[in-house]
């Protein structure tokens, strides 16, 4: 199914001398005359006695070439001297046997057969060209019905279907020769041949112009696209029906003899045999003038045999082989993980590689790895042989190999020489990001395990519990250079995803450093505890060495000073450093001997976080080389000090807080109160469950903090190993400590629901049998999740890589003026992500000035912000900055360096040719896998996430913004809407109205912002002063309340018992509750409030959603702030990446979330218009223009707006997640981009994973690459077609230049899978998913792949268009092409002058 071409094309392809590839449908003539070397007439394969191929069979040597090099079938000609001779006895050409991998044959079919890809792949290509449905076609193809090809003078219509009875009737009526009707492939062939595509195209365009129905237009546009594909290419539609079948070369479908006279064969041979057998039988039947029924059946069987060959199982039951296994057809050979694309073209096995178990190598330098001698000998064998020959030690390769096998001493000397400066690559599977493969200088070691430097373990995610690693040897000089310059471990100490150091000391190293740097200890006066003073660091170190380290208050060493004791490593001392007297400890002085001088004296404790910051600072101030040296010193120092400190934990180190009993008793009392409230019918069962869980969560936190505080303040606190380990960040966390010494806490069921009775025992006390059982119940979920989610995460990474693989840096600056705006991300008063972290390494699009001082420019437009600039902007109190982004980049292909910004892996501007798309995909995919693997570490502990109150974190003035509230009887302010917020602002002596105005125009920045939920109780008045730690508001966690805001009398409307409501007796409390239920009628359940008991004057109405429990009675008098009804929130589920990973997939696949929220389409005021077809009609009315937008909202959804609320475009009207497509339609591309980036970030942020925005932006950019044509104008584009933005603008530009009307289009959001399949390169799309559909589509319209992306070039074996040498390579190529043109030009002019 490839473009027609001669053998010369194949020769060119072999050399790789081509820069594009076209695919098309092959004609019968091409298959027979150009591809085939002969016709196969027999189904035989090989002779089972001689094992030689049968003549004329599927392995025939005459057709495919000899099985042995330079030897014909009969043995008449042997040896290379007869090259090219065709044997006169057996007809075999004397040549190399490898031609059997290239030469094809064909099978001449007795009747035309329809190719299943063109008929069965949706949309059916044949069906679309003929305008027939797939089911009609199927009946014709499989000989069930006749189709009229030429109606003649009858009353039949062309393409009309006739069953047997109808056909006989028509024949009787008009005679057999009056019309032409046929069955099977022959009928389809004739119909396709008679189709006039040009006129069909014109007719379809006409119909498309006249049709008004959207659905009909979409259908016509699809058909038009297929027909246009045939017209614009050199394909003929009748080629979709086969008269000859090409046969794959025999070496690609081998038949191998096994021991015991059996054979292993490729499934293709069985499938071909079936086709040949049926074809030969049909030919014989046709010669014998057999009855039509038998012939028809045989033809159908042949059609089915060919179907099975091309795509087994696509039509009917699959053909089974031995062991009842479906046979692998040609389609299966291409498809899926084990298909040709992914198994052989994109992933190949590599020679000169080995693998072994890894062990730690603490003695290694950062750029080294330990390579077992035996392994190195095998891997570097060719280099050793060459060196031995050069030295004259041996003269032949064979003798060199013998020498190596013997293990002669000179071999080891040569090996030592060779590996000096010859890097090797180490890889640990799974390679989730680019740090999974790094280069090291090998060091020969004894033993059989590879040794790895401790600091690179984090990058590889390796540990030493049996992990294995693969070693690869770069062979060519270029490969060695690349490994040395780009891939060495010291060049990869920062994460490309966030720019944070990845090579940071951990575990023992962190512990050792933390111990050394611990806070000073002050000895009491009576123990001679005067603070010693030293003149410089040297004196301190001398005293340390002389007096011996004193660890754990014991003297290690005999020398003492005048007070009779040695110098303690943690003792408070004074020392002169750089002219200043500093109070520090000997340990800190010792640590500073390894710190680069430029960083200054480090005089504080060193938990892992601070070590990480120090490494980053070191890189920025003193560069890579010094940082790598510093890292090695840190590793050395850390290990030595943790060994000397001899920290080990014992059971007595786990303290049980004394207040535990008291706190637990208090908790049980609170739970009893909640249970009583439930039994009295005050709260629902759901609320009881939620409140119980809240109580236990609070207890858990309280005990956890008490325990931590207790071990922290122990007299010997520096030496409580548990505290040391946790506080240093070496191992463990507060949650694990809580389980050891306080209580295990709440556990989760496998479905994520929390078991409300907690495990009150801890591991030190031991668990009861019941507690242990509950505990394992939750823990197992973690293990099961891990297994399932790892695969999900891997698949997500694969889709991300596929969608972004073509995004590379193609130019320095695209010159765009577009930008996006970024600001600090806050949650309440907490700053989740400061502005400086968001803008570091990005290009500013306009000058950034110091607020209030235009003369002071903090950053100029086009500057790529350094960390100091970003910090200055953040410190200046600037709220948001306009930066360039890959989302707005205008490069023709790929993106530009300025829009991308800094390369986070090295802090320099990104270079040309960098594969930023793949880096982005890996950055998002890698933590997904990590997180899924990490779920089980807490053993199913319930990690609930919500707080019942809001507390001020600093002093200030509280300002309500966009809040509707009502004052209840207790004087508290109850919030009535969802969209408002509380702002805490600095007290500047302004009036409340001034503050509100400044906040609404974003002229001042609030110290903290607290979004408040519906029903929240605000305890402080608007404009009141608050102090740090003061409670501002209480949040209702368990219910969504419906609150009355006006006084009056209650009247039920449409609350009909048995229809829209039902009385339910609570089993536990015995109380009767009135619950609104789902119903199908035209009822609109609501509570109306009237000013008087006679129900004359209506004050307000409140819609009641289904599931709500009504809290008031008919006719009851109520006051503002009273609860009318409550809608219980779903039981609290644990927050876990298990929910997070599917959320990321949902966002990047642009799926519609379940139970999605409705959003306002315009700015305006909310009103209700009753109910229609079980849907509530909500209207948003623009009060200025009078424009109205109707929303039909399901009665089951909970509204978060009320009548009279002002809403803005894009604001949520109901609870739930927003549909991204609606944001695009209503708010535009920018808002959608912002939404997607923030939503993906939120999932990762919840897990504490740091990913830079730019990576997510690249994925979002790829999702928004296409536009959908709404009006084609005078362009060649089609209505409803999704085209690339660049193609759309190009086409419009061409049309406008020719004076035509440009096309109109709307942006369209595609999920990553759809976007990958919609790529311009059919090779890339086919190797991703839906291989057969992609290839069919491409072949029908003769698509050309210009080999511009990564994947297609890897598949074709070309150099990839990226990497550090990409720009140079491009320039050399252009230079050579120009030279060639000049040469041709000179030659032509010379020729003319000679001829003249």
UniProtKB/Swiss-Prot annotation:
UniProt-annotated binding residues for Zn(2+) 2: 814, 889, 896, 899
Documented EC number(s): 2.7.7.6
Keyword terms: DNA-directed RNA polymerase, Magnesium, Metal-binding, Nucleotidyltransferase, Transcription, Transferase, Zinc
One Gene Ontology cellular component annotation held by this UniProt entry: DNA-directed RNA polymerase complex
Reactions that this protein is recorded to catalyse: RNA(n) + a ribonucleoside 5'-triphosphate = RNA(n+1) + diphosphate
Residues where Mg(2+) binds: 463, 465, 467
Assembly, per entry: The RNAP catalytic core consists of 2 alpha, 1 beta, 1 beta' and 1 omega subunit. When a sigma factor is associated with the core the holoenzyme is formed, which can initiate transcription.
Protein name: DNA-directed RNA polymerase subunit beta'
Organism: Chlamydia muridarum (strain MoPn / Nigg)
Gene name of the record: rpoC
């Amino acid at each position: 199914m490839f473009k027609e071409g001669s053998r010369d094309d194949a020769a060119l392809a072999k050399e790789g001398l081509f820069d594009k590839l076209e695919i098309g449908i092959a004609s019968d003539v091409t298959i027979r005359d150009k591809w085939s070397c002969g016709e196969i007439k027999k189904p035989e394969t090989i002779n089972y006695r001689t094992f030689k191929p049968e003549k004329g069979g599927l392995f025939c040597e005459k057709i495919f070439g000899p099985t042995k090099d330079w030897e014909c079938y009969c043995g008449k000609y042997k040896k290379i001297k007869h090259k090219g001779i065709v044997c006169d006895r057996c007809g075999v050409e004397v040549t190399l046997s490898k031609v059997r991998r290239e030469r094809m044959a064909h099978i001449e079919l007795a009747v035309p057969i329809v190719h299943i890809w063109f008929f069965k792949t949706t949309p059916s290509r044949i069906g679309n060209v003929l305008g027939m449905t797939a089911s009609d076609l199927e009946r014709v193809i499989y000989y069930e019905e006749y189709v009229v090809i030429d109606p003649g003078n009858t009353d039949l219509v062309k393409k009309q279907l006739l069953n047997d009875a109808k056909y006989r009737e028509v024949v009787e009526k008009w005679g057999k020769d009056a019309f032409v009707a046929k069955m099977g492939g022959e009928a389809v062939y004739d119909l396709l041949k008679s189709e006039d595509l040009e006129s069909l195209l014109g007719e379809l365009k006409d119909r498309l112009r006249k049709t008004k129905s959207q659905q009909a237009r979409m259908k016509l546009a699809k058909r038009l696209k297929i027909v246009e594909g045939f017209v614009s290419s050199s394909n003929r539609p009748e080629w979709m029906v086969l008269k000859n079948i090409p046969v794959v070369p025999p070496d690609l479908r081998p038949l191998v003899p096994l021991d015991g006279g059996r054979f292993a064969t490729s499934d293709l041979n069985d499938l071909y045999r079936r086709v040949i057998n049926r074809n030969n039988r049909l030919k014989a039947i046709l010669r014998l003038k057999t009855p039509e029924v038998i012939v028809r059946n045989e033809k159908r069987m042949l059609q089915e045999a060919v179907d099975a060959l091309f795509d087994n199982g696509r039509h009917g039951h699959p053909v089974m082989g031995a062991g009842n296994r479906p046979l692998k057809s040609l389609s299966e050979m291409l498809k899926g993980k084990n298909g040709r694309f992914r198994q052989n073209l994109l992933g190949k096995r590599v020679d000169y590689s080995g693998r072994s178990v890894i062990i730690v190598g603490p003695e290694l330098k950062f750029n080294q790895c330990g390579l077992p001698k035996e392994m190195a000998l095998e891997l570097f064998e060719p280099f050793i042989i060459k060196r031995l020959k050069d030295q004259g030690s041996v003269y032949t390769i064979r003798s060199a190999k013998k020498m190596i096998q013997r293990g002669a001493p000179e071999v080891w000397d040569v090996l030592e020489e060779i590996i000096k400066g010859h890097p090797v690559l180490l890889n640990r599977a799974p390679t989730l990001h680019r740090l999974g493969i790094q280069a090291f200088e090998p060091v020969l070691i004894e033993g059989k395990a590879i040794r790895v430097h401790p600091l690179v373990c984090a990058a590889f995610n390796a540990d030493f519990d049996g992990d294995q690693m693969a070693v690869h040897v770069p062979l060519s000089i270029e490969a060695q250079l690349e490994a040395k310059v780009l891939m060495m471990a010291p060049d990869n100490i920062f994460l490309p995803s966030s720019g944070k150091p990845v090579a940071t000391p951990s575990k023992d190293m962190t512990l050792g450093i933390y111990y050394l740097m611990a806070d000073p200890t002050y000895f009491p006066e009576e123990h001679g505890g005067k603070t010693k003073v030293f003149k410089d660091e040297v004196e301190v170190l001398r005293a340390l060495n002389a007096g011996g380290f004193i660890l754990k208050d014991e003297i290690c060493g005999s020398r003492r000073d005048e007070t009779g004791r040695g110098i303690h490593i943690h003792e408070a001392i004074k020392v002169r450093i750089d002219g200043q007297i500093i109070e520090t400890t000997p340990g800190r002085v010792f640590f500073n001997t390894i710190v680069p001088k430029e960083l200054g004296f480090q005089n504080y404790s060193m938990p892992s976080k601070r070590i990480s910051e120090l490494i980053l600072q070191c890189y920025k101030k003193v560069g890579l080389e010094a940082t790598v040296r510093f890292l090695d010193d840190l590793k050395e120092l850390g290990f030595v000090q943790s060994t000397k400190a001899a920290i080990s934990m014992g059971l007595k180190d786990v303290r049980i807080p004394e207040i535990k009993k008291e706190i637990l008793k208090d908790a049980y009392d609170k739970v009893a109160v909640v249970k009583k409230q439930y039994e009295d019918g005050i709260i629902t069962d759901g609320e009881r469950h939620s409140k119980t869980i809240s109580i236990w969560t609070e207890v858990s936190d309280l005990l956890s903090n008490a325990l931590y505080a207790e071990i922290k303040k122990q007299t010997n606190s520096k030496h409580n190993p548990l505290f040391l380990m946790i506080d240093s960040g070496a191992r463990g966390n507060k949650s694990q400590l809580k389980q050891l010494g306080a209580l295990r806490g709440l556990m989760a069921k496998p479905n994520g629901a929390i078991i409300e009775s907690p495990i009150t025992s801890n591991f030190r006390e031991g668990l009861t049998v019941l507690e242990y059982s509950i505990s394992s119940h939750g823990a197992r979920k973690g293990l099961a999740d891990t297994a399932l989610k790892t695969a999900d995460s891997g698949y997500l990474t694969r889709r991300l890589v596929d969608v972004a693989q073509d995004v590379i840096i193609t130019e320095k600056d695209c010159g765009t003026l577009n930008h996006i705006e970024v600001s600090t991300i806050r949650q309440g008063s907490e700053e989740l992500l400061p502005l400086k972290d968001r803008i570091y390494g990005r290009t500013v699009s306009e000058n950034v000035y110091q607020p209030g001082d235009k003369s002071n420019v903090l950053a100029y437009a086009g500057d790529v912000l350094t960390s100091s600039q970003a910090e200055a902007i953040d410190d200046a109190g600037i709220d948001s900055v306009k930066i360039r982004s890959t989302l707005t980049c205008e490069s023709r292909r790929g993106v530009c360096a300025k829009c991308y910004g800094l390369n986070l892996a090295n802090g320099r501007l990104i270079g040309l040719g960098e594969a930023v798309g793949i880096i982005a995909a890996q950055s998002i995919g890698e933590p997904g896998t990590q997180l899924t693997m990490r779920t089980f570490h807490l053993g199913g502990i319930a990690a609930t996430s919500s707080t019942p109150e809001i507390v001020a974190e600093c002093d200030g003035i509280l300002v309500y913004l966009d809040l509707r509230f009502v004052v209840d009887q207790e004087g508290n302010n109850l919030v009535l809407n969802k969209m408002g917020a509380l702002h805490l602002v600095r007290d500047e002596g302004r009036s409340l109205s001034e503050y509100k105005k400044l906040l609404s125009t974003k002229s001042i920045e609030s110290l903290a912002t607290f979004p408040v939920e519906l029903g929240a109780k605000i305890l402080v008045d608007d404009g009141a002063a608050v102090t740090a730690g003061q409670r501002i508001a209480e949040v209702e966690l368990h219910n969504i309340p419906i609150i009355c805001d006006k006084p009056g009398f209650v009247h039920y409307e449409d609350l009909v018992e048995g229809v829209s409501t039902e009385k339910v007796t609570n089993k536990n409390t015995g109380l009767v509750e009135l619950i609104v239920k789902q119903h199908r009628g035209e009822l609109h359940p609501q509570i109306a409030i009237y000013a008087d008991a006679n129900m004359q004057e209506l004050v307000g109405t409140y819609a009641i959603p289904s599931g709500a429990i009504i809290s008031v009675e008919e006719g009851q008098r109520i006051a503002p702030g009273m609860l009318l009804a409550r809608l219980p929130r779903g039981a609290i589920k644990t927050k876990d990446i298990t929910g997070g990973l599917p959320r990321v997939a949902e966002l990047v696949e642009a799926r519609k979330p379940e139970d999605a929220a409705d959003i306002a389409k315009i700015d305006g005021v909310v009103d209700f218009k009753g109910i229609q077809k079980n849907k509530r009609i909500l209207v948003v009315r623009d009060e200025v223009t009078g424009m109205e937008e109707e929303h039909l909202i399901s009665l089951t959804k909970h509204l978060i707006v009320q009548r009279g609320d002002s809403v803005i475009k894009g604001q949520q009207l109901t609870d739930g997640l927003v549909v991204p497509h609606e944001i695009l339609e209503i708010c535009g591309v920018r808002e959608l981009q912002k939404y997607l980036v923030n939503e993906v970030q939120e999932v990762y942020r919840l897990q504490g994973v740091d990913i830079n925005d730019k990576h997510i932006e690249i994925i979002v950019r790829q999702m928004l690459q296409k536009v959908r044509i709404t009006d084609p104008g005078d362009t060649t584009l089609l209505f409803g077609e999704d085209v690339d933005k660049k193609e759309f603008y190009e086409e419009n530009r061409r049309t406008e230049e020719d004076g035509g009307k440009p096309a109109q289009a709307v942006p369209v959001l595609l999920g990553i899978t759809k976007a990958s399949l919609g790529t311009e390169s059919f090779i890339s799309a086919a190797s991703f998913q839906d291989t057969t559909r992609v290839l069919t589509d491409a072949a029908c319209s003769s698509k050309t792949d210009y080999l511009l992306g990564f994947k297609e070039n890897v598949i074709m074996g070309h150099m990839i268009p990226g990497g550090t040498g990409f720009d140079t390579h491009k320039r050399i190529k252009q230079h050579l092409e120009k030279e060639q043109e000049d040469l041709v030009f000179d030659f032509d002019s010379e020729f003319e002058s000679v001829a003249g």
